[in-house]
Amino acid sequence: MAISRDAPIMAALGAAAVVGLGSEAFVASKPLQAQSAPSTSSLRGATTVPGSESFGGASRTLAVGAGAVATAVLGRGALLRRRATAVKKKGVRVVEGKEIPWNLFSPKAPYEGSCVSKETITSKTPLVNWETCHVIMDHGGKVPYIEGQSIGVIAPGPDKKGETPAKIRLYSIASSAPGDDESSKTVSLVVKRVVEVAGRGWCEYSNVEKGKDPEFPDAEKVYRGVCSSHICDLEAGDDVLITGPTGAEMLLPEDPEANMIFMATGTGIAPFRSHLRNLFHDKVSKGKFKGCAWLFLGVPFSESLLYDEEWKEMQAEFPGQFRYDYAVSSEEKSEKNKINGEMWVQHKMMEYGEDLWQLVKDPKTHVYMCGLKGMESGFAECFQEKVEAEGMVYTEFLKKMKKDKRYHVEVY
């Protein structure tokens, strides 16, 4: 399936076949010989082979231990039903019948990595917390992960409660499994420096003595995020305490013909950069993906468009498979926004409502959201009327998407 800017997306889908799934009808991208619900046992980058294994290009030998035992009962002409029980292995979790790396390093026993490089990737804006950094860390191949997972970072402390070291903070990984350098020995994060100043937005706590903050000496209260400041202050060669990896909500399906709609706000772009580099950039996987991916990014200022050039270059190289659209809330207006008239992610999506609706109905399409919690209601704002126009109930439609594991959300 291709994405075209010059014609509706469904023109690029070819003849559509309506396929019944339960009590609802969905549009499939091509006529099918036999249709089943989307697979729930195939995760891109995961493995089921015991012994020496590779997680999305990061190889390691699994700890010796009992494996997962799966039993299946296949009714003639019916769907395969699987029942699996897993005996825990250190550093491994079974997710949908697949083994993925999991908590190889804990807060009590973190991996001692190091900073390879740090780059500020935003320009200054009127916001006090404008600075966002792309940080590459060396894990020596000891912390393998797959796209869509997270790692933890432990700052030296103290945190806002005076605890030393500070508590672990989880960050979505912004690199594909081989890492930005494709060595399988690095991991990248995109981190916003948290700064809260009384009188310039919300500021509940203060961890800077009044008058001592060099940037805001007159502020009554200033709070600087402990872990985000630690990461954004890193220099090449500095030590970093890493935990994880963890997380299974944002993993990609293994089907190379699956389609993805990615919705992100701010640093919620991280897991999608991980996925998109896997799909369109890395030597080990480039060219294998046959579906399409559509990225929507929402930010307050154009100076905050994270990895903007990277997405534009990717779109130019893969015009039929990848599309990139963004909403800049302080600079664009939308009549669809009845709250303040600003352009938010869902309002940008509404500009392509019918094209997106045809994709959302396709049982091969997965929807991913990462960032502000409001995106969930924004998704409903986009598609509830379209669902109901076809005689379905939105809550039931969404429940079906979740059951089919086509709806993936990490919001805060």
Task: Show the residue positions of the predicted features.
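Classical protein tyrosine phosphatase
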Residues: V143-A166, M263-L295
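Transmitter module of two-component histidine kinases
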Residues: E196, C232-L234, T246-A264, P271, ...
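N-terminal organelle-targeting presequences
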Residues: S39-I151, K160-G162
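Reductase modules of NAD(P)H-dependent flavoproteins
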Residues: K88-R93, I100, F105-Y111, V240-E249, ...
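N-terminal chloroplast transit peptides
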Residues: A2-S54
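Metal-dependent catalytic core segments for phosphate chemistry
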Residues: V187-D233, D238-D239, S274-R277, K286, ...
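Ferredoxin-reductase
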Residues: I100-F105, E112, V116-E235
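Transmembrane alpha-helices of multi-pass eukaryotic membrane proteins
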Residues: A2-A12, G56-G67, A258-I261
